[in-house]
Amino acid sequence: MNSSAASPPAVSPHAAPSRTTVRARAALQVELDGGGTARITELRAAVPVLPRRTGGSGRVVVVHLVGGAGGPLAGDDLGLDIIVGAGAHLVVRSVAATVALPGHGAGPSTFALRAQVGPAAMLSFLPEPTVVARGARHRMTTEIILAADARLRYREEIILGRFGEPGGDLETSLRVDVDQAPGPAPTTDAGTAPAPGPRRRPLLHQELRLGPRVPGVAGPAVLAGARAVGSVLVAGPATGLEPVTAAVGDSVALMPLAGPGVLVCALADDALALRRRLDSLAGVLTGSLADPLPVGS
């Protein structure tokens, strides 16, 4: 009898390391308690999406997103569900930039944000930039539903490539809808109420495609050579100040929305210049439509 153990199969030194794609969806819900203080009623982390409370007081809760692993890599499917209850204000930030990397998984990496903001509530979603590394394919999807009197501050910053390298491919989709304020049901001359129509209207539906596979992306009609692109959306009931008017400046555009709301878009050579250009209009955004952010948030 031959009792010698079988030799292990030979492994090529050039073989790609195996990695299981990651599928993770975290959840975060904030509600006011009976005393009017905001409390986190659900906080579900899912590696690598790790929300952590870091501050806030009164009706405000501040949460930072902590990355529990590198990436995302190709094929990773990540997401975050948010609910902000009536009267609460949730501020979401991240501790560092997200770097989308190439990998051996099938399809692009994805990150999906879904949020519902209740009556008289506010969501400030202000993460650090997303860097799309060379060779990466990344897709970002955001769907937000606002109550009729809810407020929103949403920032999105994209950096194409790490330092000294070209960027990868990116697709983004941003959809923000507003629930109509409840009112009396319409009636006909006969006094019978017709079937109710849709009670939700679009505020902003926007898609963006960037990367070497997009024809003319570096031309003057799109990026004009810029490596950083970003936007800030502020929406909610006006505070009685003068309406915001459309304006176009040096690589910055401000567009009022029928919401009311304001969308600011900017291009820049790097992340720092992009943030400065977006923040240059922070006074308009803060003063006209949204509560100031709490100190230390």
Swiss-Prot record:
Residues 1-20, 178-201 are annotated as: Disordered. Its main location: cytoplasm. It is found in: Cytoplasm. Disulfide bonds: none annotated. It comes from the Bacteria. One of its GO terms (molecular function) is nickel cation binding. Keywords: Chaperone, Cytoplasm, Nickel insertion. UreD, UreF and UreG form a complex that acts as a GTP-hydrolysis-dependent molecular chaperone, activating the urease apoprotein by helping to assemble the nickel containing metallocenter of UreC. The UreE protein probably delivers the nickel. This is Urease accessory protein UreD. It comes from Parafrankia sp. (strain EAN1pec).
